Design a protein with these regions (language model features):
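Rossmann-like AdoMet
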Residues: 1-111, 115-116, 262-265, 274, ...
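A residue-level signal for conserved active-site and pocket-lining positions in enzyme catalytic cores
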Residues: 27, 119, 250
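Conserved RecA-like P-loop NTPase ATPase core
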Residues: 59, 119, 204
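Generic detector of well-ordered alpha-helical packing
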Residues: 85, 106, 124-127, 205
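Conserved acidic residues
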Residues: 116-117, 198
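A mobile, often basic/glycine-rich helix-loop segment
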Residues: 118-121, 126-168, 213-224
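Long, Lys/Arg- and hydrophobic-enriched amphipathic alpha-helices
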Residues: 162-307
């Protein structure tokens, strides 16, 4: 059993089944043993997954151009900074060389108290811990994680309540099982408190309210050595765990939605022909993956905020 698994199994045996949010938080973000906190680098060829920047360097250049275009729309350009959520290894920072830059992680670093600029969240929200809800004949219940016979297992928990019940009342999809990302809504509140004037650009894979029918049993997946695995309870701390982003609740958080489109549409709007020609000449397969693989799967949500 993994070290995180030892911790969680002892907790469950002592106190009973735990929320999946607790399980995912420990698996990914335990201070010493979590997937994203260990010395091992999860990114790249030797890791478990690639980000868009790692697949094709032109991605960072194009996103930087998009951000500069947004900066040009603002009157107070001198105070403009970019706050990147989930900065990872900081690959975006060099491309944003002429902009002020602050990297903020899931539980490290803090949002500036008041700033003008852009909040960039590239593949950030999909790695936030989520709650899991199940639709039953008696109503909605929260799924829990139990430990029995030497392994972690799903268990039915109590009826949803509090903020979880409020979310379900507003956004419950037509699905038997689905994820609820309350942490994402908390991050949007932080952004609204901190962003005096500017934009929020979220790039991630996900769905709108109308598209939830495609995922009748939810979207949770784990990743190991570039393979997608459905058993998200196995080997906590050794695998990445993700859930698709529900974009509709983010659009209703109080900011103005400017555009919601595919990542490919965003990149094609930001780029110039010679940049794509150079990228195609350097590595045509990588550019095709960026534009027609990830580019069609990933969504880009651009919002504006002003106090």
């Amino acid at each position: 059993m993994t070290p995180v698994g030892e911790i969680l199994s002892r907790e469950i045996l002592a106190t009973g089944p735990i929320r999946f949010h607790r399980f995912m938080s420990a698996a990914l973000y335990h201070p010493e043993l979590g997937y994203y906190r260990k010395a091992r680098d999860p990114f790249g060829r030797l890791g478990d997954f690639f980000t868009a920047e790692q697949i094709q360097p032109v991605f960072g250049i194009l996103i930087a151009q998009c951000i500069r275009q947004l900066r040009d729309e603002m009157a107070d350009k001198n105070d403009f900074i970019v706050v990147e959520l989930g900065a990872g290894r900081g690959e975006m920072s060099p491309a944003l060389g002429d902009c002020g830059y602050i990297g903020v992680d899931h539980d490290r670093g803090a949002m500036p108290e008041s700033f003008c600029g852009v909040v960039l969240a590239n593949e950030f929200f999909d790695a936030l811990p989520v709650h899991v809800v199940k639709r039953t004949d008696a109503g909605f219940i929260e799924r829990r994680v139990d430990f029995a016979d030497g392994e972690f297992q799903w268990a039915d928990g109590p009826a949803v309540s509090g903020a979880l019940a409020e979310y379900v009342e507003r956004f419950a999809p037509e699905a038997e099982i689905f994820e609820v990302n309350l942490d994402a809504l908390e991050w949007m509140k932080r952004i609204q408190r901190s962003l005096r004037r500017g934009f929020v650009l979220i790039i991630d894979y996900g769905y709108t309210q109308r598209e939830t029918i495609r995922f009748p049993r939810g979207t949770l997946m784990s990743y190991r050595h570039h393979s997608a695995l459905e058993d998200v309870l196995a080997a906590p701390g050794e695998r990445d765990i993700t859930a698709h982003v529900a974009f509709t609740p983010l659009m209703q958080c109080g900011l103005e939605t400017i555009r919601f489109e595919t990542m490919a549409q965003l990149l094609l709007r930001a780029g110039e022909k010679d940049q794509f020609a150079a990228a195609m000449a350097a590595n045509p397969q990588q550019l095709k993956t960026l534009l027609f693989g990830m580019g069609e799967t990933f969504r880009a949500l651009l919002m504006r905020g002003e106090k």
